[in-house]
Curated annotation (Swiss-Prot):
PANTHER family registered for this protein in UniProt: 50S/60S RIBOSOMAL PROTEIN L16, LARGE RIBOSOMAL SUBUNIT PROTEIN UL16M
PROSITE patterns: RIBOSOMAL_L16_1, RIBOSOMAL_L16_2
GO CC annotation: cytosolic large ribosomal subunit
SUPFAM superfamilies (UniProt xref): Ribosomal protein L16p/L10e
Entry's Gene Ontology BP terms: translation
Keyword set, alphabetical order: Ribonucleoprotein, Ribosomal protein, RNA-binding, rRNA-binding, tRNA-binding
Segments forming a coiled coil: none
Database matches in InterPro entries: Ribosomal_uL16 (IPR047873), Ribosomal_uL16_bact-type (IPR000114), Ribosomal_uL16_CS (IPR020798), Ribosomal_uL16_dom (IPR016180), Ribosomal_uL16_sf (IPR036920)
Protein name: Large ribosomal subunit protein uL16
Family under the similarity heading: Belongs to the universal ribosomal protein uL16 family.
HAMAP family: Ribosomal_uL16
Organism for this UniProt entry: Proteus mirabilis (strain HI4320)
Transmembrane region(s): none
């Protein structure tokens, strides 16, 4: 599972997921899976989508993961009263804004890439779309 090796602080504030996306263009591969909605992806969801894509292309071509879960999410244990400090870090998430390219793929036909991204999109909680690299 993806998570940072080191962080400056163990826990962070909840914050808000606003603003515009960085990394909106397909830059490494030929095809991409772009987020249409706003939300957050857990490390487990990112890995599940990657596995689905890898199996769909039968380990051909190359896949790039363009998102990284760098925000720790804390939870308190079950049946624990409020107070007594912030909970323990349970999982890591990546904040996603509309327009962000989540995955890229190269070295496979377009139909295969579309099918693989469709399987990956089913594992993700946000709406996505298939995009291709635009040459200028």
């Amino acid at each position: 599972m993806l998570q940072p090796k080191r962080t400056k602080f163990r826990k962070v504030h909840k914050g808000r997921n606003r603003g515009l996306a960085i990394g909106t263009d397909v830059s490494f591969g030929t095809y991409g899976l772009k987020a249409v909605g706003r939300g957050r992806l857990t490390a487990r969801q990112i890995e599940a989508a990657r596995r689905a894509m890898t199996r769909a292309v039968k380990r051909q071509g190359k896949i790039w993961i363009r998102v990284f879960p760098d925000k720790p999410i804390t939870e308190k244990p079950l049946e624990v009263r409020m107070g007594k400090g912030k909970g323990n870090v349970e999982y890591w998430v990546a904040l996603i804004q509309p327009g962000k390219v989540l995955y890229e793929m190269d070295g496979v036909p377009e139909e295969v890439a579309r099918e693989a991204f469709q399987l990956a999109a089913a594992k993700l909680p946000i709406k996505t779309t298939f995009v291709t690299k635009t040459v200028m």
